[in-house]
């Protein structure tokens, strides 16, 4: 009789086999909303709502949590790592036709946050998952720490001035004050630098100047971008080898083979389109860089 319970939700035998590999039937009976990993939540909720044999009051907490998980996961699927609490309230109220009050939703959110297993509070308005909270904290700490480390200049002051003057002659126009300041700053060999600016502000020219500057120190240089098109554009504009970030990290379709135990073998890495890289990939990239030897410019 217990096994017949699951047929209330699906008669797909292969799906049922997969469900029972993960959950015991007793667990499913106790919380049928755990089936959201396999079955659409609206379908689960419809069965429970229309079946008088279910104790709706006992399942209320699990129901709310299921909708919280669904809302947060949909937000993440849309490439956002944080979700407004208010959006969760609105989502659940809309999906349940105002059958659940805000105070109950707030209570379940607070319990999940206090639990610390799934949800983390960013501030009073925003939430994220524990996973992305840890990923983005790792990024923040790594960037802040390495942005302060200097390994010593590539060229002395006189040599750098001569280098910039030579670049201006070769390219046929002068660097503006900001571009010269950037080259002076990057000459200090900080572990991490960022190059910001809108299209047409001279980022590519500055990046070319940085790459040529580093070429005086090492030939272990690589450029990478999120997309193949951007990667090809960098190669055309700078003359340096350029690949996608996935290729840089030696992605084989299942895993990234450049990682904490197998660091990238470069002295200088230029990453364009870094703003298009999601948090997870950005963290994987940082983890694969050996900052004892490597400096990175993100643009």
Model region roles, listed by residue range:
Residues 1-299:
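Conserved ATP-binding/catalytic motifs of P-loop helicase motor domains
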């Amino acid at each position: 009789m217990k096994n017949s319970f699951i047929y209330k939700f699906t008669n797909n035998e292969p799906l049922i086999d997969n469900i029972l590999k993960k959950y015991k039937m007793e667990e499913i009976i106790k919380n049928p909303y755990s089936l959201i990993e396999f079955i659409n939540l609206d379908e689960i909720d419809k069965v429970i709502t229309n079946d008088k044999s279910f104790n709706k009051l006992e399942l209320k907490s699990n129901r709310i949590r299921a909708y919280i998980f669904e809302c947060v996961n949909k937000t993440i699927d849309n490439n956002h790592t944080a979700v407004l609490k208010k959006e969760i309230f609105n989502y659940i109220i809309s999906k349940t036709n105002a059958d659940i009050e805000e105070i109950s939703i707030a209570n379940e959110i607070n319990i999940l946050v206090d639990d610390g297993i799934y949800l983390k509070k960013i501030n009073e308005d925003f939430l994220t998952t524990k996973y992305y909270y840890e990923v983005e904290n790792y990024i923040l700490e790594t960037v802040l720490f390495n942005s302060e480390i200097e390994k010593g200049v590539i060229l002395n002051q006189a040599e750098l001035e001569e280098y910039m003057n030579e670049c201006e002659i070769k390219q046929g126009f002068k660097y503006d004050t900001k571009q010269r300041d950037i080259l002076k700053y990057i000459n200090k060999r900080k572990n991490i630098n960022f190059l910001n600016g809108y299209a047409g502000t001279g980022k590519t020219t500055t990046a070319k100047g940085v790459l040529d500057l580093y070429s005086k120190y090492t030939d272990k240089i690589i450029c990478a971008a999120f997309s193949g098109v951007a990667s090809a554009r960098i190669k055309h504009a700078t003359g340096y080898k350029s690949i996608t970030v996935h290729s840089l990290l030696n992605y084989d379709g299942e895993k990234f083979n450049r990682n904490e135990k197998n660091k990238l073998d470069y002295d200088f890495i230029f990453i364009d389109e870094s703003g298009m890289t999601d948090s997870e990939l950005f963290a994987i990239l940082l983890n694969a860089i050996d900052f004892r030897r490597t400096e990175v410019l993100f643009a």
